[in-house]
């Protein structure tokens, strides 16, 4: 199973599929059936099957899987720090740091 993500074609669908593949790999490593994972997380088995085949799942259900596989800390770090690619973006980030609302 290939786990590469082409950084030049950053498509949400690719990320969703990669997360689904990774989740399935973690499930199989633990020896869980979809039914067992469903019982442990409260995520319906058909939802898990759809996620593993299409990459589509609600964020709430995805978070339940993340917690079950003990990736809470890693997930909580996503979007925790600003990212920028240009000096202009960095200036905007610093200027807007104290803002509470978008425009």
Annotate each predicted stretch with a short phrase.
Residues 21-36, 95-102:
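Short basic helix-loop element that most often maps to the first helix and adjoining turn
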Residues 2-28, 78:
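A short, Lys/Arg-rich alpha-helix, primarily the initiator
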Residues 23, 34, 45, 59-62:
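Helix-turn-helix DNA-binding elements, focusing on the entry/boundary residues of the two helices
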Residues 54-68:
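Short, basic-rich loop-to-helix N-cap that marks the start of a DNA-contacting helix
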Residues 31-49:
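Short alpha-helical DNA-recognition segment
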Residues 76-103:
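Short, charged recognition helix plus adjacent turn
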């Amino acid at each position: 199973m290939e786990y590469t993500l082409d950084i030049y074609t950053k498509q949400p669908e690719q990320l969703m599929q990669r997360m689904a593949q990774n989740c399935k790999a973690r499930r199989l490593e633990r020896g869980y059936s979809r039914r067992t994972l469903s019982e442990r997380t409260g995520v319906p088995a058909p939802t898990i099957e759809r996620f593993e085949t299409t990459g589509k799942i609600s964020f709430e259900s995805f978070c339940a899987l993340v917690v079950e596989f003990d990736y809470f800390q890693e997930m909580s770090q996503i979007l925790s720090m600003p990212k920028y690619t240009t000096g202009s973006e960095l200036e905007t980030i610093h200027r807007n740091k104290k803002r509470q609302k978008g425009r």
